[in-house]
Amino acid sequence: MRVGVTLACTECKRRNYTTTKNKKNDPNRIEMKKYCRFCQTHTLHKETR
């Protein structure tokens, strides 16, 4: 079952990306390095509720 999730920048706390994840394969929160246009650099983005 795929569900939509939002990724937030850990530096500025802005929610920049939306994506989907498979809850069966990834039961924990997702963490990805993505580009933040507000920080203007690649930062760690974490899944928000």
Curated annotation (Swiss-Prot):
Q: Name one GO molecular function term.
A: structural constituent of ribosome
Q: Which PANTHER family match?
A: 50S RIBOSOMAL PROTEIN L33, CHLOROPLASTIC, LARGE RIBOSOMAL SUBUNIT PROTEIN BL33C
Kindly list the GO CC terms recorded for this protein. cytoplasm; ribonucleoprotein complex; ribosome
Q: Can you supply a Gene Ontology BP term from the record?
A: translation
Q: Domain of life of the organism in this record?
A: Bacteria
Keywords attached to this entry: Ribonucleoprotein, Ribosomal protein
What PROSITE patterns does the record tag this protein with?
RIBOSOMAL_L33
Q: Which Pfam families does this entry report, sorted A to Z?
A: Ribosomal_L33
- This chain belongs to the protein called Large ribosomal subunit protein bL33
Q: Which family does it belong to?
A: Belongs to the bacterial ribosomal protein bL33 family.
The keyword Nucleotide-binding is annotated on this UniProt entry? no
